[in-house]
């Protein structure tokens, strides 16, 4: 090997080693802060975990209580948002993938959907406040909070459904249509079955996303210190209670905020892991 080749080889090895070192340092840097955040969350939230947390409502200052009404309110609004947003998102994604795939309208719809996907959640909350809350006499409610969350669920489900249906091999469509099956029946019985894991993954990721949203609920659900099961009345939610209690001077409220944050983090982690596991186990072949 000539001197020039040896010099070039050593230079490449040095650059490679430097790049690997920088990458490892960057990964460790991010991992360090992730572990720090999780440790802080566990150390401050774990002491407040108990039966009272899930069975008692939010207490007055300096008194013991729980977050039962907040858990219930969040569950109600998330469930309503998923129930309303999922069928609309699947229908829109199906149209994009199967009916309007080559039209100019579909390109516009995808562009608008991408904008909605990246829109700040507080803007969506203000939109629902202007569109619905103000026209009902400024009446905050769980339903208006769910409507705000629908606009977060919708673009996620639309994008996921569109992508998953387009991943289904074209041979499956051709085989079904060659048997004389109508297109709508082919979509329901063939495409949806093949893409069901991916679509369900998108729904679960949307659920994980809306579970921790605070900003859109400030202008819609507003919050409630008491137990309420009426979806047309103000209702408590876990993110709103955490926001209020974490900034308060009362240690009992701060402990509840940390405990609620821990429960929410564990829930989102489990939902995200479940969604990714489901997707990995049911990959759609590209051939």
Swiss-Prot record:
GO terms for biological process: phosphate ion transmembrane transport. The keyword Transport applies. Keywords: Cell inner membrane, Cell membrane, Membrane, Phosphate transport, Transmembrane, Transmembrane helix, Transport. Pfam families: BPD_transp_1. It is a multi-pass membrane protein. Its main location: membrane. One of its GO terms (cellular component) is plasma membrane. The chain crosses the membrane at residues 22-42, 70-90, 115-135, 138-158, 187-207, 255-275. GO terms for molecular function: phosphate transmembrane transporter activity. Residues 71-275 form the ABC transmembrane type-1 domain. InterPro entries: MetI-like, MetI-like_sf, Phosphate_PstA, Phosphate_transprt_permease. CDD domains: TM_PBP2 (cd06261). It is found in: Cell inner membrane. Part of a binding-protein-dependent transport system for phosphate; probably responsible for the translocation of the substrate across the membrane. Belongs to the binding-protein-dependent transport system permease family. CysTW subfamily. This is Phosphate transport system permease protein PstA. The gene is pstA.
